Amino acid sequence: MGDIDFQAMEFAYEKHADQNAGTAPRHQVVVVGAGPVGLTTALDLARQGVRVVVLDDDYRLSTGSRAICFSKRTLEIWDRLGVGQRMIDKGVSWNVGKVFFREQEVWRFDLLPEPGHRRPAFINLQQYYAEGYLYEQARQEPNIDLRWKNKVAGVVQADDGVDLTIDTPEGPYTCLLYTSPSPRD
């Protein structure tokens, strides 16, 4: 299977039913951002039966790399979410690190795997691959509602939760991130 060009993928804005609701729709979990942390969080919660709305103000995955090195613990979490091996297969694994000042090595560390560990200490992998693999996994998860071109523009604390104002290409809408139980029930 050839690599998907995740940098070239674009996601169309889709108007959501929440935008037509007469009262602010309620959600228990809203994740802001479809980067590595947001998608990992959404997948982990969704796998535990929690419905998650993911809002991202962009129309594409990352086109650069703000994150490029991922640790063993992150890989273990991604294993649990079904994408760990794919990340390792694509990335560059390493256990020994060296720090240089000009031509001189000033520090060296060795994080070779301990007995029973299945993953390398680190992998280097461009962020758009990490996001792409997580995105593909999230698309298969019925508990994740991923909304592109939805930007959180306002957050107001309320007695029963938090009111979010979300800007979209078709105008703003509001939803309630509620505490349980909500007095608005």
Where are these regions (language model features)?
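Extreme N-terminal leader/targeting segments of oxidoreductases
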Residues: M1-V29, R47-Q48
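N-terminal Rossmann-like FAD-binding beta1-loop-alpha1 element of flavoenzymes
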Residues: Q28-V54
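Residue-level detector of alpha-helix initiation sites
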Residues: G35-P36, L61, S65
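Active-site-adjacent segment of FAD-dependent monooxygenases/related oxidoreductases
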Residues: S71-Q137
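A conserved short coil-to-beta-strand element within the FAD-binding core of flavoproteins
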Residues: W148-G161
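Core beta-strand elements of the Rossmann-like FAD/NAD(P) dinucleotide-binding domain
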Residues: G171-L177
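Conserved small/polar residues in nucleotide/adenosyl-binding loops
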Residues: Y178-D185
